[in-house]
Swiss-Prot record:
Membrane topology of the entry: Single-pass membrane protein
Entry-linked Pfam families: TNFR_c6 (PF00020)
Lineage: Viruses, Duplodnaviria, Heunggongvirae, Peploviricota, Herviviricetes
Classification via InterPro entries: TNFR/NGFR_Cys_rich_reg
Protein name, entry field: Membrane glycoprotein UL144
Gene3D superfamilies: Tumor Necrosis Factor Receptor, subunit A, domain 2 (2.10.50.10)
BP GO annotations: defense response to Gram-negative bacterium; defense response to Gram-positive bacterium; negative regulation of alpha-beta T cell proliferation; positive regulation of cytokine production involved in immune response; positive regulation of T cell migration; symbiont-mediated activation of host NF-kappaB cascade
Highest taxon listed in the record's lineage: Viruses
Cysteines paired by S-S bonds: 59-71, 74-87, 77-95
TNFR-Cys repeat residues: 58-95
Signal peptide start-end: 1-20
Length: 176
């Protein structure tokens, strides 16, 4: 009886994973809802529902958006640093040590150390989409569930009780 209870629990978990919404490219997932995103420099103050839209609030001066729900205080460069970029409602302050020299090319900030005569590069890696991860996880859990169900049915039909009471058990047992 325990394998049957475990199988039912596993099925309920699998159904819950299947109910998870996958939002469109122009939406963000807030809780269990797919909502339109807030504008630049705004944070979510109330999640949307099926009947209401998301409520957004601009971050106050001296803060920037950090995630979907938070405004974080801007960093203040200390005396050993120079400010490269001011804090805005969408980005934190960028500070760097004073012993570096800076130069700009169109749209790109570079810095070069005086002592080592080389350019430092910042690499930004694009994350994998959560949708692909969720799809593979759901498929894996589904396949494990099917395998467990098959093993449970084989064990049930091979048991002596099933062979004595069920004619289909006898037929199934002979074919294995």
């Amino acid at each position: 009886m325990k394998p049957l209870v475990m199988l039912i629990c596993f099925g309920v978990i699998l159904l819950q994973l299947g109910v998870t919404k996958v939002c469109q490219h122009n939406e963000v997932q807030l809780g269990n809802e797919c909502c339109p995103p807030c504008g630049l420099g705004q944070r979510v103050t109330k999640v949307c529902t099926e009947r209401t839209s998301v409520t957004c609030t601009p971050c106050p001066n001296g803060t920037y958006v950090s995630g979907l729900y938070n405004c974080t205080d801007c960093t203040q460069c200390n005396v050993t640093q120079v400010m490269i970029r001011n804090c805005t409602s969408t980005n934190n302050t960028v500070c760097a040590p004073k012993n570096h020299t800076y130069f700009s090319t169109p749209g790109v900030q570079h810095h070069k150390q005086r002592q080592q005569n080389h350019t430092a590069h910042i690499t930004v890696k694009q994350g994998k989409s959560g949708r692909h991860t969720l799809a593979w996880l759901s498929l894996f859990i589904f396949l494990v569930g099917i395998i467990l169900l098959i093993l449970y049915l084989i064990a049930a039909y091979r048991s002596e009780r099933c062979q004595q009471c069920c004619s289909i058990g006898k037929i199934f047992y002979r074919t294995l």
